[in-house]
Amino acid sequence: MPRRDDLKTIMVLGSGPIKIGQAAEFDFSGSQAVQALREDGYEVILVNSNPATIQNDPEMADIIYIEPLIPDTIRRIMEIEKPCALLAGMGGQTALNIASELAHDGSLERLGVELIGSDLDAIDKAEDRELFNQVCESIGLPISEAIACNSMDQVLAAADEIGSWPILIRPAFTLGGLGGGTAWDLGQLVEIATLGLRNSRISQVLIEESILGWQELEYEVMRDGADNATIVCTMENIDPMGVHTGESTVVAPLQSFSDADHQILRDQALRLIRALNIKGLSLIHI
């Protein structure tokens, strides 16, 4: 992609502490992004709450803030530094949530900060469970029966509509599935859904039919602003659905699928990243 001369200063959000859902790969990708931006002549402002990372080394960025990764802090730093653009895609779920909130509350527009990489529409489509399902349906991707809910009454009605147990609860805009789980009865459903609604930034959970025991695959897909896309890596979880992918044993590349199966899944992954309009790297679970 050509260099943009209208941008002078770019703020990069780190991912914070290493934990399930945000592991060391975000430190590596963030470090590479900072180096690439500086090599292209941009001034880089890095904000990260974890001092024990490569990207926080003094020589990495022009300006480094070791501050909490929360919207109020990022907004305050933007008011001080006045960056031209914000790059959140290298900071994982935490950074994407911050960027989405700052865009929705008007802070980015008020401060004249452009969200680069994946835009707000792409973030919302990937993180909002209802919007994501609509995108999948629009391009003909098969999905399990699922209903997006914003209240406990809707959760109970959705469970009745699905009509079988167990039921999966998936909160929107949370890190590593925080607040989600599998409910085997009504009591567990109420308990997990209450936690999920509380942890979701938009108070939304997806009530989904069970796919426990199914095989889980992961496709790392990269796409640029000119719509060039490629599969970087394929991975196969040894443990079935029901074991958190952060705790599952994973092998790369796919081991038990034929090339014909891989080509079908590859095409679906590429169609999805294009439909979501994601620019950068995306991990697609299948």
Identify the residue ranges that each predicted region occupies.
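N-terminal beta-alpha lobe that positions the nucleotide/phosphoryl donor
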Residues: M1-L283
